[in-house]
Regions:
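Anion-coordinating catalytic cores for phosphoryl-, nucleotidyl-, and glycosidic chemistry
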Residues: 2-43, 47, 54-63, 185-577
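Alpha-helix C-terminal capping segments
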Residues: 4-11, 76-79, 104-111, 144-152, ...
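Basic/charged alpha-beta structural segments of nucleotide/phosphate-handling enzymes
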Residues: 10, 21-154, 168, 311-327
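Residue-level detector of anion-binding/catalytic polar loops
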Residues: 122, 180, 508
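Conserved RecA-like helicase ATPase core segment
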Residues: 125-126, 130, 155-202, 208-211
Length: 577
């Protein structure tokens, strides 16, 4: 993975601003290939450049730069303060529209003057958020470009690479500072285009192509681009695992890498951790959720999980037999006789002093104490992914210290909810071994260069993109300020630029699309001709060899008296599984 540009004119004193973090990595690899051990220029993605430049020109600023998650929290508070019931989808849309307003230089007064009810409401939220930042003496990343424009010192001109179209904010800033463009070498105008009957056929063919190519040329870097990687992730992973025989191989050792992170809260390890914190709070308040209790005591991550595995499973059956959503500790205690180690853990947690309302940083200390008391992640050796997740949790949970600066005291249950919300905003992907086969989305693939490349899913749902105007910005204002996908002219230009970037992923790029996806009909992108239809041979399915055992004869039963059958049936009926 490289960028297709000549870096001979750059020196260690230069700075380079790239469109995204993956291009930053590709730039460093390209520099090492072209310039060897020469000192590397400073390289930044766009937001990193803003933060680094602001800190350089304001080293002693009294204002604190808040993170994106802190910013979301303050926006949420502003919306709630103005009477809005906030959910995650609404907050995501509001944050996206605020980013549009800053990037495309839309003033809140324009929205107020539009006389659209949604726009007026959104403008009120934005103004309240701005006032909140002034009160707290903080900044977010959207404030930095204006501060840099009003600087009192000179800034060296950066090189730019990988930007399809500069936003008005970026254009204004770089016009003020001055810049040079690091041009990409994009000579290709043609590609090999193929059609398949189903997406399964398409993915299977591409996986086979990648495997064969890798076996013949293991040194080649191969890119497989899927515009719908989020929705097709599991299908792609399943088929590639079958083709590469990687079903039982851990993430870090697979022959390929899928570049798709998930929110921390989507990982079972983190869900177990949060359940432990919830149960700790419930034990202290003496109102225990059956669902949470059963999830925690059967967790493989708490202390002595392997030693008491069977007896804890039986305890789950006992708790389920009560048919209660919640229960108290005195109801549970008589049944802990067969799980003495678990009994000691529960008594240790429940006997701790009950904390009332505290600041978030104090709750973080309490949470760490709970995890230590439960012996979380100590009963067995963690896998590589689990180890990375635990480290990421420990780093991310420090965000509660930041919440303590902008929030009042909260209850234990609210602190757990806030921690869960914070973790859900952090996208995590475990580091894997270096592999030459990369499966990635179209946005992060643009601007990169590989030895071989294949782009899946070239349907009319992908290129050109559908009209998608912002929810809180009127259509005329969105089109006037050139917000992406807000009118057909912008969509057509973006589609042309995207196709040009994808065609130049390699010297020879394959494009393909499938006629059907899970029984839904699909149509090709009108930007490319598809005349070569591939008939994918049916995948051979051979039944597994079965070993037959002659069980018509057996040893005679010595003791024909049967007892305890009622108890066995009772246990089976009580079992949830």
């Amino acid at each position: 993975m490289w960028i297709n540009a000549n870096l001979a004119s750059l020196t260690a004193q230069d700075s380079v601003v790239l469109a995204n973090n993956r291009q930053v990595l590709a730039f460093k690899k390209t520099w090492n290939l072209q310039r060897g051990t020469s000192a590397l220029p400073q390289t930044f993605a766009w937001k990193q450049y803003l933060q680094n430049t602001w800190k350089a020109i304001n080293p002693n600023s009294s204002k604190r730069l808040i993170s994106a998650i802190e910013s979301r929290t303050l926006i949420n508070q502003s919306m709630t303060r103005l009477g809005q019931i906030v959910d995650t989808r609404l907050l995501d849309e509001v944050v996206k529209n605020m980013d549009y307003c800053h990037a495309h230089l839309i003033n809140p007064t324009q929205l107020l003057d539009s006389h659209h009810q949604n726009s007026e409401l959104f403008s009120a939220w934005m103004l309240d958020y701005q006032q909140t930042k002034l009160t707290l003496n903080v900044l977010d990343v959207n404030d930095l470009s204006t501060l840099i424009l009003n600087r009192d010192r000179e800034i060296s001109q950066p090189y730019l690479y990988g930007f399809k179209t500069l936003t008005p904010e970026q254009s204004g800033l770089f016009a003020n500072i001055g810049h040079q463009v690091l041009s990409a070498n994009q000579p290709n105008t043609h590609s090999s285009n193929q059609t398949f009957n189903t997406t399964s056929d398409e993915i299977f063919h591409v996986a086979t192509w990648a495997k064969d190519l890798h076996s013949k040329h293991p040194e080649k870097h191969i890119a497989i681009v899927s515009p719908q990687l989020n929705s097709e992730h599991h299908q792609i992973k399943s088929i590639f695992d079958q083709v590469f025989d990687d079903v039982l191989v851990g993430t870090g050792q697979k022959a390929y890498n899928i570049s798709l992170g998930l929110p921390l809260t989507d990982y079972p390890f983190i869900r177990h951790l949060l359940s432990v914190l919830q149960l700790s709070q419930q034990l202290q308040s003496n109102r225990i959720s059956t669902e949470t209790f059963n999830a925690v005591i059967t967790s493989p991550y708490i202390a002595h999980a392997q030693v008491e595995q069977s007896s804890r499973a039986l305890l789950v059956n006992q708790v389920l037999s009560w048919s209660q959503t919640h229960f108290k500790l005195n109801q549970l205690s008589p049944h802990l006789i067969n799980t003495p180690l678990l009994d000691a853990l529960i008594n240790n947690i429940s006997s701790k002093a009950v904390s009332g309302r505290q600041k978030h940083d104090q709750w973080l200390l309490s949470f760490n104490t709970y995890l230590l008391a439960w012996g979380f992640a100590t009963d067995r050796t963690l896998s590589s992914v689990e180890y990375q997740l635990f480290n990421k949790y420990q780093q991310t949970s420090l965000g509660l210290n930041q919440l303590a600066q902008i929030n009042d005291k909260v209850s234990a249950s609210q602190a757990v909810v806030d921690l869960q919300t914070w973790l859900s905003q952090v996208i995590f992907q475990a580091q894997s071994a270096k592999t030459p086969i990369q499966i990635l989305g179209s946005l992060e693939a643009e601007g990169l260069y590989f030895d071989e490349a294949w782009v899946l899913g070239m349907t009319d749902d992908f290129l050109p993109a559908a009209l998608n105007a912002p929810r809180f910005i009127p259509n005329d204002i969105a089109a006037q300020h050139q917000i992406p996908h807000s009118n057909f002219e912008l969509i057509a230009k973006d589609a042309k630029d995207t196709l040009n970037n994808l065609i130049n992923l390699s010297d020879q790029v394959n494009f393909s699309y499938a006629k059907t996806h899970f029984e839904s009909e699909q149509h090709r992108s009108p930007l490319l001709p598809f005349n070569n239809e591939i008939e994918t041979p049916k995948q051979p399915h051979q039944p597994a060899l079965l070993e037959t055992i002659n069980d018509t004869q057996a040893a005679p039963l010595v003791d024909k008296q049967v007892s305890g059958g009622v108890g066995i049936l009772k246990d089976q009926m009580a079992c949830a599984f």
